[in-house]
From Swiss-Prot:
Subunit structure: Component of the mitochondrial contact site and cristae organizing system (MICOS) complex.
Mitochondrial matrix topological intervals: 42-96
Membrane topology annotation: Single-pass membrane protein
Biased composition range(s): Basic and acidic residues: 212-246
PANTHER family hit by this protein: MICOS COMPLEX SUBUNIT MIC60, MITOFILIN
Biased composition (Low complexity): 46-65
Keyword Coiled coil included in the entry's annotation: yes
Coiled coil regions, renumbered to chain: 295-440
Lineage: Eukaryota, Fungi, Dikarya, Ascomycota, Pezizomycotina
Similarity remark: Belongs to the MICOS complex subunit Mic60 family.
Ranges facing Mitochondrial intermembrane side: 118-624
Protein name: MICOS complex subunit mic60
Transmembrane regions: 97-117
GO terms classed as biological process: cristae formation
Length: 624
């Protein structure tokens, strides 16, 4: 019973927890769906690998896994559904294309309209081939026109034009000033029988084989009827032309021209001239008397207009004269006011300049007075100081005279045993000087002797050793005894460190090693620079059978160089022997390279001992 109730209560609790979990997951799922469409800096999270957590001693349980109750299937909460995949982001290519197309079209139309307004050729091309180009150009031209002529929009109260009914005046419908004259002869170009014959001939050109007999008969009858009708028409016209001429119309009384004597304006004269031309045209017409009333009325109006223009001009002249008089009065008043202001400003400036001048004059006078006082004070001080100096000089001169007199008196008193005190003092000073000089000579001699002993120790090590022996301690002793002398430092620095660390061979060792090297050089004397194994073998065999020859002066062959080097070594001239061996080339020089390096070290040491340390030894012999 207890178990069943416990199970039921557990299932109830699990169901409530499951409902709460589902209710909590729903808003979270909606939020994840809303956030899926947004972009953040870290949309794609790296996959989290489930690394095994190491078991700690505290986490280990003493309960065996068999006794742990397994969770019931109802206790497992269902997993929330996975969020839907993020929708694909729109690229907006069509919008970009449409935007670029609109911008490009706008720039193209704008540039085209600008060029069309500047160039006539491009204007024709743009308005003819570009859609809506003519409307755009007309719109901007109207805007430019209204900008240049803004008064065109003011007279909007005028009656609109009646463009609905168009009046057409046919040609040759008016009157002419010439009297109609009859033509003197026949005009061949007018229509008549001769023209109809040609037309009928063209119409009658048919294929003879293609026409039927009935059509031929009908065509002939039709042509006969037309020719008869045309002949009748020609006879009627001839009768009309043969009628007698009517008498000409009587001459029309000419209309007087309009004159405006007072109108000397150019516009009025042009208007009168135009009106007179119209009168001339009307007077040449037969019905000129019909227009005489209108012409006279126009003359009166023209004369009235001239009088009005003259009146307006007189009024404008009077108004201009009044304005000129008023401007003159205003100008005179302004000039008087300007002169008054100028006088006031000049008086004010003069007073100000006078005050400044007085102040500056007082300042300069005060400064000059101070300068004069300072100069007088300095001159007085200089004079007083000069007097003091003269008094001091006189006092010094008196003291000198007094001392001289006292000295003379003392010298007279010394004529006895104190007469040679000065000579004794001079001799004592000379002895002190000689003692000091000899002390320096003795110290230098002692130092030179010690240095000579150290140098002799180095030489004895080099000459008496049968094998190369290092002489580092001897060189250290020489360096310490030199006490920082630059010559000794340079001599020691010129020696190769390998020479005094490992030692140098003696002259006998150098000669002995030269003989061994000479044998090897003779074996390789016949080898070229790029010799192989066969060349080495051939050179070895030939060197055994070669005859030794005497050294020839100026010869640079291997045998001569070796002989000259051997003679120089026997004489003890290592420098010239090294120079001779250095002239070898090829394999001979390569084989003698080690021997040359040893000789070079020996020469460096000897040069340092003889050339650089030689002056110290000569100085020692000099003092000894």
């Amino acid at each position: 019973m207890l178990r069943s109730s416990f199970t039921q209560s557990r299932q109830l609790l699990l169901s409530q927890a499951r409902s709460r979990t589902a209710a909590q997951w729903l808003p979270k799922a909606g939020a994840s769906n809303r956030l899926a469409g947004q972009r953040f800096f870290a949309d794609a999270k790296p996959p989290v690998t489930g690394a095994p957590t190491p078991a700690s001693p505290s986490s280990e349980s003493s309960i065996p896994p068999e006794t742990v109750p397994k969770p019931s299937p109802a206790a497992e909460a269902p997993l929330p559904p996975p969020p839907p995949p993020a929708p694909a982001r729109k690229t907006g290519r069509f919008r970009k294309f449409l935007l670029y197309l609109i911008l490009t079209s706008g720039f193209a139309y704008g540039g085209g309209i600008f060029l069309a307004l500047k160039s006539d050729n491009f204007h024709d091309f743009f308005t003819e081939y570009v859609p809506y180009g003519e409307d755009c150009v007309l719109y901007f031209e109207e805007r430019d026109f209204y900008r240049r002529f803004p008064n065109t929009l003011r007279n909007q109260n005028r009656a609109p034009k009646d463009e609905g009914h168009t009046v057409t005046i046919p040609s040759k419908s008016g009157l002419s000033w010439k009297v109609a004259e009859e033509e003197s002869g026949a005009d061949v170009s007018q229509k008549g029988p001769h023209m109809s014959a040609l037309d009928n001939g063209d119409k009658a050109q048919l294929k003879p084989g293609a026409a039927k007999p009935e059509e031929k008969v009908a065509t002939v009858e039709k042509v006969k009827a037309e020719s008869a009708a045309k002949e009748q028409t020609a006879e009627d016209k001839k009768k009309v032309k043969e009628e007698p001429k009517k008498p000409a119309a009587p001459a029309v009384t000419p209309i007087e021209f309009a004159t405006v004597s007072e109108g000397d304006e150019e516009v009025v004269q042009e208007l009168v001239k135009t009106f007179n031309d119209i009168i001339t045209v009307i007077g040449a017409d037969e019905n000129a008397h019909k227009f005489s009333g209108a012409v006279n009325k126009a003359k009166e109006e023209l004369r009235t207009i001239g009088e009005k223009i003259i009146a307006i001009r007189n009024e404008a002249r009077k108004a201009a004269q009044e304005e000129i008089k008023q401007a003159h009065a205003t100008f005179d008043e302004s000039a008087r006011e300007l002169i008054r202001r100028f006088e006031e400003a000049r008086a004010h400036d003069a007073a100000q300049y006078r005050e400044e001048f007085e102040a500056e004059r007082e300042r300069l006078a005060r400064a000059y007075q101070e300068k004069v006082n300072t100069e007088l004070q300095r001159a007085q001080e200089v004079a007083e100081q000069r007097l003091k100096n003269e008094l001091v000089e006189q006092a010094i001169e008196l003291n000198r005279k007094y001392l001289h007199e006292v000295k003379d008196l003392v010298e007279r008193e010394r004529e006895g045993r104190l007469s040679k005190l000065n000579e004794l003092t001079a001799n004592v000073n000379l002895l002190e000087k000689l003692t000091t000089d000899w002390k320096e000579v003795i110290d230098t001699n002692l130092k030179t002797q010690q240095l000579q002993v150290a140098v002799d120790a180095v030489r004895s090590v080099l000459e008496r050793s049968t094998v190369p022996r290092p002489f580092v301690r001897e060189l250290v002793a020489v360096k310490e005894l030199a006490a920082g002398d630059p010559v000794v430092e340079a001599a020691i620095a010129s020696i190769n460190p390998t020479a005094y660390q490992r030692g140098i061979p003696s002259t006998s060792q150098i000669i002995e090693r030269f003989r061994r090297v000479a044998d090897e050089v003779r074996k390789a004397s016949l080898l070229p620079e790029d010799a192989g194994i066969a060349s080495h073998a051939a050179s070895l065999v030939l060197s055994k059978v070669m005859f030794k020859k005497d050294a020839v002066a100026g010869s640079d062959d291997v045998e001569s160089v070796l002989l000259r080097t051997e003679h120089l070594l026997e004489e003890g001239n290592l420098d010239d022997a090294a120079r001779e061996m250095n002239t070898l080339k090829g394999w001979a020089k390569i084989l003698s390279k080690d021997w040359l390096s040893d000789v070079r070290r020996v020469l460096e040491v000897k040069q340092a001992l003889e050339v650089r340390l030689g002056p110290f030894t000569s100085l020692f012999h000099l003092y000894r």
